[in-house]
Design a protein with these regions (language model features):
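Short linear sequence motifs
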Residues: 1-2, 16
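Cationic, low-complexity basic patches in intrinsically disordered or flexible, solvent-exposed regions
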Residues: 3-7
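PLP-dependent amino-acid enzyme catalytic core
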Residues: 9-254
Length: 254
Protein backbone atom coordinates (compact mmCIF):
# COMPACT_ATOMS: atom_id res chain seq x y z
CA UNK A 1 0.00 0.00 0.00
CA UNK A 2 1.38 3.39 -0.95
CA UNK A 3 2.42 5.41 2.08
CA UNK A 4 1.13 8.96 2.68
CA UNK A 5 3.32 11.87 1.68
CA UNK A 6 4.90 13.97 4.39
CA UNK A 7 2.78 16.93 5.53
CA UNK A 8 4.36 20.19 4.42
CA UNK A 9 2.18 23.21 5.12
CA UNK A 10 3.11 26.79 4.25
CA UNK A 11 1.77 29.71 2.27
CA UNK A 12 3.25 30.96 -0.97
CA UNK A 13 2.11 32.87 -4.03
CA UNK A 14 1.56 30.82 -7.17
CA UNK A 15 3.88 31.85 -9.97
CA UNK A 16 3.49 30.97 -13.63
CA UNK A 17 6.10 28.50 -14.83
CA UNK A 18 7.96 29.53 -17.94
CA UNK A 19 7.57 27.38 -21.03
CA UNK A 20 10.08 24.61 -21.57
CA UNK A 21 12.89 25.51 -23.94
CA UNK A 22 15.32 23.29 -25.75
CA UNK A 23 19.06 23.47 -25.22
CA UNK A 24 22.06 22.18 -27.12
CA UNK A 25 23.76 19.02 -25.93
CA UNK A 26 27.12 19.89 -24.43
CA UNK A 27 29.80 18.00 -22.57
CA UNK A 28 32.20 18.82 -19.76
CA UNK A 29 31.77 21.20 -16.82
CA UNK A 30 30.37 24.02 -18.97
CA UNK A 31 27.82 21.70 -20.52
CA UNK A 32 26.67 20.39 -17.14
CA UNK A 33 26.25 23.91 -15.76
CA UNK A 34 24.23 24.89 -18.83
CA UNK A 35 21.94 21.92 -18.29
CA UNK A 36 21.62 22.74 -14.58
CA UNK A 37 20.43 26.24 -15.47
CA UNK A 38 17.73 24.67 -17.63
CA UNK A 39 16.66 22.18 -14.94
CA UNK A 40 16.46 24.88 -12.25
CA UNK A 41 13.42 26.36 -14.01
CA UNK A 42 11.36 23.37 -12.94
CA UNK A 43 12.24 23.34 -9.25
CA UNK A 44 10.68 25.63 -6.66
CA UNK A 45 7.88 28.20 -6.75
CA UNK A 46 5.32 25.42 -6.46
CA UNK A 47 1.58 26.16 -6.19
CA UNK A 48 -0.20 26.91 -2.95
CA UNK A 49 -3.45 25.08 -2.20
CA UNK A 50 -5.88 26.28 0.48
CA UNK A 51 -6.97 23.59 2.94
CA UNK A 52 -10.54 23.92 4.18
CA UNK A 53 -12.68 21.95 6.60
CA UNK A 54 -9.99 21.30 9.21
CA UNK A 55 -11.14 24.01 11.60
CA UNK A 56 -14.02 26.40 12.33
CA UNK A 57 -11.98 29.52 13.06
CA UNK A 58 -12.42 31.91 10.13
CA UNK A 59 -9.32 33.85 11.20
CA UNK A 60 -7.09 30.82 10.63
CA UNK A 61 -5.88 30.03 7.12
CA UNK A 62 -4.03 26.81 6.26
CA UNK A 63 -2.22 26.15 3.01
CA UNK A 64 -0.46 23.09 1.62
CA UNK A 65 2.53 23.60 -0.63
CA UNK A 66 2.13 21.43 -3.72
CA UNK A 67 5.69 20.14 -3.84
CA UNK A 68 4.67 17.38 -6.23
CA UNK A 69 4.79 20.07 -8.92
CA UNK A 70 8.58 19.99 -8.71
CA UNK A 71 10.62 18.08 -11.24
CA UNK A 72 10.51 14.44 -10.01
CA UNK A 73 7.30 15.03 -8.04
CA UNK A 74 8.36 15.88 -4.50
CA UNK A 75 10.02 18.42 -2.21
CA UNK A 76 13.19 16.30 -2.44
CA UNK A 77 13.93 17.81 -5.85
CA UNK A 78 15.10 20.96 -4.08
CA UNK A 79 17.75 19.22 -1.98
CA UNK A 80 18.83 16.82 -4.73
CA UNK A 81 19.34 19.68 -7.18
CA UNK A 82 21.33 21.75 -4.69
CA UNK A 83 23.52 18.79 -3.74
CA UNK A 84 24.24 17.98 -7.39
CA UNK A 85 24.80 21.60 -8.40
CA UNK A 86 27.36 22.20 -5.66
CA UNK A 87 29.09 18.87 -6.29
CA UNK A 88 29.52 19.76 -9.97
CA UNK A 89 30.72 23.29 -9.15
CA UNK A 90 33.33 21.92 -6.74
CA UNK A 91 34.49 19.27 -9.22
CA UNK A 92 33.51 16.38 -6.94
CA UNK A 93 30.90 15.12 -9.40
CA UNK A 94 31.70 14.70 -13.08
CA UNK A 95 30.27 12.73 -15.98
CA UNK A 96 32.87 10.06 -15.22
CA UNK A 97 31.59 9.37 -11.70
CA UNK A 98 28.44 7.67 -10.45
CA UNK A 99 26.27 9.57 -8.01
CA UNK A 100 25.67 7.29 -5.01
CA UNK A 101 23.34 7.73 -2.06
CA UNK A 102 20.91 6.01 0.29
CA UNK A 103 17.22 6.77 -0.11
CA UNK A 104 13.73 5.64 0.78
CA UNK A 105 12.65 6.63 -2.71
CA UNK A 106 11.80 10.30 -3.25
CA UNK A 107 15.31 11.77 -3.11
CA UNK A 108 16.48 8.89 -5.26
CA UNK A 109 13.83 9.68 -7.84
CA UNK A 110 15.00 13.30 -7.84
CA UNK A 111 18.64 12.24 -8.26
CA UNK A 112 17.67 9.90 -11.11
CA UNK A 113 15.54 12.48 -12.92
CA UNK A 114 18.23 15.14 -12.71
CA UNK A 115 20.99 12.66 -13.47
CA UNK A 116 19.18 11.50 -16.59
CA UNK A 117 19.01 15.08 -17.87
CA UNK A 118 22.69 15.65 -17.09
CA UNK A 119 23.96 12.35 -18.45
CA UNK A 120 25.23 11.30 -15.01
CA UNK A 121 24.72 7.74 -13.78
CA UNK A 122 22.96 7.21 -10.45
CA UNK A 123 23.22 4.27 -8.02
CA UNK A 124 20.92 4.08 -5.00
CA UNK A 125 20.96 1.96 -1.86
CA UNK A 126 17.28 1.28 -1.24
CA UNK A 127 15.51 -0.83 1.41
CA UNK A 128 14.03 -3.89 -0.26
CA UNK A 129 10.55 -3.12 1.09
CA UNK A 130 10.31 0.23 -0.71
CA UNK A 131 7.12 0.45 -2.75
CA UNK A 132 7.15 -1.18 -6.17
CA UNK A 133 5.94 2.08 -7.68
CA UNK A 134 9.11 3.84 -6.54
CA UNK A 135 11.30 1.03 -7.81
CA UNK A 136 9.55 1.13 -11.19
CA UNK A 137 10.09 4.88 -11.46
CA UNK A 138 13.76 4.57 -10.55
CA UNK A 139 14.28 1.83 -13.12
CA UNK A 140 12.50 3.88 -15.79
CA UNK A 141 14.89 6.77 -15.10
CA UNK A 142 17.90 4.51 -15.51
CA UNK A 143 19.01 4.34 -11.87
CA UNK A 144 20.82 1.31 -10.49
CA UNK A 145 19.13 -0.05 -7.35
CA UNK A 146 21.26 -1.69 -4.67
CA UNK A 147 18.84 -3.51 -2.37
CA UNK A 148 19.38 -3.50 1.39
CA UNK A 149 17.55 -5.35 4.15
CA UNK A 150 13.93 -4.29 4.72
CA UNK A 151 14.51 -4.62 8.46
CA UNK A 152 17.35 -2.10 8.54
CA UNK A 153 15.41 0.62 6.73
CA UNK A 154 17.26 3.66 5.45
CA UNK A 155 19.74 3.40 8.32
CA UNK A 156 21.20 0.23 6.82
CA UNK A 157 20.99 1.76 3.35
CA UNK A 158 23.13 4.66 4.59
CA UNK A 159 25.70 2.25 5.99
CA UNK A 160 25.85 0.36 2.70
CA UNK A 161 26.28 3.54 0.66
CA UNK A 162 29.07 4.77 2.94
CA UNK A 163 30.80 1.39 2.64
CA UNK A 164 30.67 1.43 -1.16
CA UNK A 165 31.93 5.01 -1.30
CA UNK A 166 34.86 4.11 0.94
CA UNK A 167 35.75 1.00 -1.08
CA UNK A 168 35.42 2.66 -4.51
CA UNK A 169 36.25 6.38 -4.11
CA UNK A 170 37.18 6.85 -7.78
CA UNK A 171 33.97 5.25 -8.98
CA UNK A 172 31.39 7.03 -6.82
CA UNK A 173 30.50 10.50 -5.64
CA UNK A 174 28.73 9.90 -2.33
CA UNK A 175 26.01 12.54 -2.04
CA UNK A 176 25.19 11.66 1.60
CA UNK A 177 21.91 13.56 1.78
CA UNK A 178 21.58 12.98 5.53
CA UNK A 179 24.83 14.81 6.34
CA UNK A 180 25.19 17.11 3.33
CA UNK A 181 24.70 20.77 4.27
CA UNK A 182 23.45 21.50 0.77
CA UNK A 183 20.30 19.60 1.75
CA UNK A 184 19.05 22.04 4.38
CA UNK A 185 20.58 25.03 2.60
CA UNK A 186 18.28 24.39 -0.36
CA UNK A 187 15.43 25.35 1.95
CA UNK A 188 17.25 28.04 3.91
CA UNK A 189 18.09 29.96 0.74
CA UNK A 190 15.10 28.84 -1.32
CA UNK A 191 11.92 27.62 0.35
CA UNK A 192 12.13 29.93 3.36
CA UNK A 193 12.89 33.00 1.27
CA UNK A 194 9.84 32.31 -0.87
CA UNK A 195 7.68 32.10 2.25
CA UNK A 196 9.04 35.31 3.76
CA UNK A 197 8.58 37.20 0.50
CA UNK A 198 5.05 36.02 -0.18
CA UNK A 199 3.70 35.54 3.34
CA UNK A 200 5.43 37.97 5.72
CA UNK A 201 2.71 37.42 8.33
CA UNK A 202 3.21 33.62 8.57
CA UNK A 203 2.76 32.35 12.14
CA UNK A 204 3.32 28.57 11.88
CA UNK A 205 5.37 26.20 9.74
CA UNK A 206 4.79 22.42 9.77
CA UNK A 207 6.86 19.70 8.07
CA UNK A 208 7.52 15.98 8.46
CA UNK A 209 10.96 14.63 9.35
CA UNK A 210 13.07 12.39 7.15
CA UNK A 211 16.56 13.71 6.55
CA UNK A 212 15.29 16.77 8.49
CA UNK A 213 16.60 19.04 5.72
CA UNK A 214 13.26 20.62 4.82
CA UNK A 215 12.38 21.36 8.43
CA UNK A 216 15.82 22.50 9.58
CA UNK A 217 16.59 24.76 6.64
CA UNK A 218 13.18 26.38 6.39
CA UNK A 219 12.52 26.81 10.11
CA UNK A 220 16.03 28.14 10.79
CA UNK A 221 15.58 30.96 8.29
CA UNK A 222 12.00 31.68 9.36
CA UNK A 223 13.11 31.96 12.99
CA UNK A 224 15.81 34.44 12.00
CA UNK A 225 13.17 36.48 10.21
CA UNK A 226 10.67 36.31 13.08
CA UNK A 227 11.49 34.42 16.31
CA UNK A 228 7.77 34.29 17.14
CA UNK A 229 7.03 31.91 14.25
CA UNK A 230 6.24 28.43 15.55
CA UNK A 231 8.07 25.64 13.71
CA UNK A 232 6.42 22.25 14.23
CA UNK A 233 7.95 18.93 13.13
CA UNK A 234 6.11 15.63 12.69
CA UNK A 235 7.59 12.16 13.15
CA UNK A 236 6.34 8.61 13.81
CA UNK A 237 5.74 7.87 17.49
CA UNK A 238 7.41 4.44 17.33
CA UNK A 239 10.61 3.09 15.79
CA UNK A 240 8.93 0.46 13.58
CA UNK A 241 6.29 2.45 11.70
CA UNK A 242 6.42 1.40 8.04
CA UNK A 243 6.26 4.94 6.69
CA UNK A 244 8.72 5.31 3.83
CA UNK A 245 10.95 8.34 4.24
CA UNK A 246 9.92 9.17 7.79
CA UNK A 247 12.33 8.99 10.73
CA UNK A 248 11.79 8.24 14.41
CA UNK A 249 14.65 10.44 15.60
CA UNK A 250 15.31 8.72 18.92
CA UNK A 251 16.18 5.45 17.18
CA UNK A 252 17.22 6.46 13.65
CA UNK A 253 20.45 7.62 12.05
CA UNK A 254 20.13 11.19 10.78
Amino acid sequence: MQQPAKPFFISIKVKKMSNRVSYKQQTGSHGLKHKLDHISRFIGNTPLLPITGLHQNKDVKIFAKAEWKNLSGSVKARAAFNIIKNAISSGKLTENKILLDATSGNTGIAYAAIGQKLGIKVALCLPENASQERKDILHSLGAEIINTSPFGGTDEAQEKAAELAKDFPKKYFYASQYTNDNNWKAHYYGTAIEIIRELPEISHFVAGLGTTGTFVGTSRRLKEYNPAIQAISLQPDVAIHGLEGWKHLETAIV
